[in-house]
């Protein structure tokens, strides 16, 4: 069987099969024969392996938002050869089969591409953390290159939010009494996943309270003893979460508490 040289440039080839003239056989010999030569041609497509080089990708992106990445498809046999494009690529997170980020994007004729990649194309939530972005040449999108991939890392930073704030109705608290308040911390970009063991800060009007950890359901509760010298009227309570290595910070304000002073006739 003929062997195609390893350095053959991918492309379409016409293969000539040649049978030479044979006019010299001794016809007195049994089974001998003479014939004129002929040629036959067959079409051949030479394919080579491909590789995707990612040239530019941001270090991080906010969950639910889009990021832009660029790169190029390379001839994996000889990276110095020009690629004969275009071809199509797809983009997805490694080990996440729930959705493809980009189903198909067409490269230029030299194999380069710039593509906008949504982190949550179906809008059904995305987990936060460091993820591996994979770019893969779509099988069959080019006659000359076999499927190849490239990858790079990106941090998907989750969006957080305080929900279920309490008290939810207007509440009057007397000076000298204690008032309870709190909320639930969730990762809104991941279907309101409850965030446990998060450090939460609270500020009652102008007074900072000791920090507390949210429980397994993401709930944190505070209690504040209102001093007799506290200002009267509607006050604002602010809850703070300073974020983490994979989550954005957030804050919220509770404005349902009014401080009053008891009177004696």
Residue ranges and their predicted role:
Residues 12-13, 75-96, 185-208:
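Short flexible loop/turn segments that cap and initiate beta-strands
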Residues 100-110, 210-217:
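Short, acidic Ser/Thr/Gly-rich low-complexity loop/linker segments typical of extracellular
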Residues 4, 9-37, 119, 123-150, ...:
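Enriched for extracellular/lumenal, surface-exposed ectodomains of secreted and cell-surface proteins
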Residues 45-53, 155-163, 258-265:
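Extracellular interdomain linker/stem segments of modular secreted and single-pass surface proteins
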Residues 55-61, 167-173:
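Short beta-strand segments of immunoglobulin-like
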Residues 64-78, 135, 174-190, 222, ...:
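Beta-strand-rich structural segments
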Residues 9-10, 63, 109, 127-128, ...:
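Surface-exposed loops/turns
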Residues 1-2, 111-117, 152, 218-224:
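Short strand-edge motifs at loop-to-beta-strand transitions and within beta-strands
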């Amino acid at each position: 069987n003929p062997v195609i040289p390893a350095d053959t440039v991918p492309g379409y080839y016409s293969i000539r099969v040649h049978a030479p003239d044979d006019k010299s056989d001794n016809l007195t010999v049994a089974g001998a024969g003479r014939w004129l030569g002929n040629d036959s041609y067959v079409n051949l497509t030479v394919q080579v392996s491909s590789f995707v080089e990612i040239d530019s990708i941001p270090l991080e992106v906010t969950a639910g938002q889009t990021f832009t990445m660029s790169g190029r498809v390379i001839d994996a046999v000889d990276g110095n050869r020009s690629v004969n494009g275009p071809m199509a690529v797809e983009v997805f997170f490694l080990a996440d089969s729930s959705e493809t980020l980009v189903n198909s994007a067409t490269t230029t004729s030299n194999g380069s591409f710039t593509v906008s990649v949504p982190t949550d194309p179906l809008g059904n939530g995305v987990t936060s953390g460091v993820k591996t972005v994979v770019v893969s040449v779509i099988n069959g999108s080019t006659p000359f290159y076999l499927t190849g991939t490239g990858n790079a890392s990106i941090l998907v930073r989750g969006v957080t939010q305080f929900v279920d704030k309490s008290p939810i109705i207007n509440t009057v608290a007397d000076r000298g009494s204690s008032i309870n308040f709190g909320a639930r911390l969730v990762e809104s970009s991941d279907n309101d996943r409850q965030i446990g063991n998060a450090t939460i800060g609270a500020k009652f009007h102008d007074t900072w309270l000791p920090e507390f950890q949210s429980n397994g359901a993401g709930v944190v509760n505070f209690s504040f003893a209102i001093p007799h010298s506290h200002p009267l009227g509607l006050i604002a309570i602010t809850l703070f979460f300073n974020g983490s290595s994979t989550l954005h910070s957030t804050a919220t304000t509770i404005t349902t508490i009014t401080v009053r002073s008891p009177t004696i006739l």
